[in-house]
C-alpha cells in the first residue's frame, strides 16, 4: 500500500486587500463639488485652487469645474486645481 505522511502546516497565505488608490478624475474632466479626484497615501499630489484635502490625504473638488494638473514651485510639486467653466 502507498502511504504519505501528513504535510506540515504553513504560516503563510495571507495578504491585505487592495486599497483602490490612484487618480479617479483626470485632467480636463468635468467634476461636481464633492467629487473625489485622487486617493493617495501621503501628499503625492497637493491641493490647489478649489480642491480640499481629506484626513487620509484624499483630494476632492470644492466647486464644480474642470480638473487641472500643474507642476509648480521650487520643489516641482504636483498640484491639482479645479478651474470654473
Curated annotation (Swiss-Prot):
Belongs to the bacterial ribosomal protein bL27 family. SUPFAM superfamilies: Ribosomal L27 protein-like (SSF110324). GO terms for molecular function: structural constituent of ribosome. This is Large ribosomal subunit protein bL27. Keywords: Ribonucleoprotein, Ribosomal protein. InterPro entries: Ribosomal_bL27, Ribosomal_bL27_CS. GO terms for cellular component: cytosolic large ribosomal subunit. Residues 1-20 are annotated as: Disordered. One of its GO terms (biological process) is translation. PROSITE patterns: RIBOSOMAL_L27 (PS00831). It comes from Citrobacter koseri (strain ATCC BAA-895 / CDC 4225-83 / SGSC4696).
Amino acid at each position: 500500500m502507498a502511504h504519505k505522511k501528513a504535510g506540515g502546516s504553513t504560516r503563510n497565505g495571507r495578504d491585505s486587500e487592495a486599497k483602490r488608490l490612484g487618480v479617479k478624475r483626470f485632467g480636463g474632466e468635468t467634476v461636481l463639488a464633492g467629487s473625489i479626484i485622487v486617493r493617495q497615501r501621503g501628499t503625492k499630489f497637493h491641493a490647489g485652487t478649489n480642491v480640499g484635502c481629506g484626513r487620509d490625504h484624499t483630494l476632492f473638488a470644492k466647486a464644480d469645474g474642470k480638473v487641472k494638473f500643474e507642476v509648480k514651485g521650487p520643489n516641482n510639486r504636483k498640484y491639482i486645481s479645479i478651474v470654473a467653466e
